[in-house]
Amino acid sequence: MKFSAALVVAAMGAAPAAGLPTDINGDLPPRMYSNLSGLQSKYARGIMAQAKREHLGSQGCRAGIATALVESTLIMHANMAVPASLAYDFDRLGKDADSIGLFQQRASIYTNIKCSMDVACSAHQFFKEMKTVPQWKYMPVGKLCQEVQHSENPERYDEFINQATEICQAAGF
């Protein structure tokens, strides 16, 4: 199993965010967000940077962060059922069907495994689907997450809206 540098740093007790690369984070500086570990904060920055690149505003940011919190706890998941996912950096093995990455995107639907295992690319996949939802800019964020993900537990998204809002606001959304 591969571990990211952030997880190793966190396990050693150092301040993980300070040593993280910022290339996936656009113009967002390394920092910790609302009850997130350094590793989770790194992934949150990647999602938020993609939301900024796509000009999705607070609504897009909150939907992306809330979804990743629910689906993966903002931890990169590979899956033994998707052997190709094991070739990329991951932090945890998942076992939900053929779901991988931060958004638990189904490999049978999102066939570019490399993309699903990459923070910016997987966020783009999520946002691309999100933008097809009619009136996505105006609906409640939890409902928007459900419209994109089609979860068996749609109520879970609402549980993370406040945290997602705090994280996005701290990043300037």
Language-model features, listed with the residues they occupy:
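Fungal secretory targeting signals
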Residues: 1-22
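Peptidoglycan-targeting cell-wall enzymes and recognition modules
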Residues: 25-42, 46, 72-138, 150
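Acidic helix/loop microenvironments that form the catalytic cleft of cell-wall polysaccharide enzymes
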Residues: 68-72, 137-159
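Extracytoplasmic/secreted envelope proteins and their assembly/folding machinery
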Residues: 41-48, 61-64, 102, 120-127, ...
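Intrinsically disordered, low-complexity
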Residues: 20-42, 157-173
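Cell wall/extracellular polymer interaction/catalysis modules
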Residues: 56
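Short, functionally critical alpha-helical segments immediately adjacent to catalytic or ligand/cofactor-binding
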Residues: 48, 59-75, 148-149
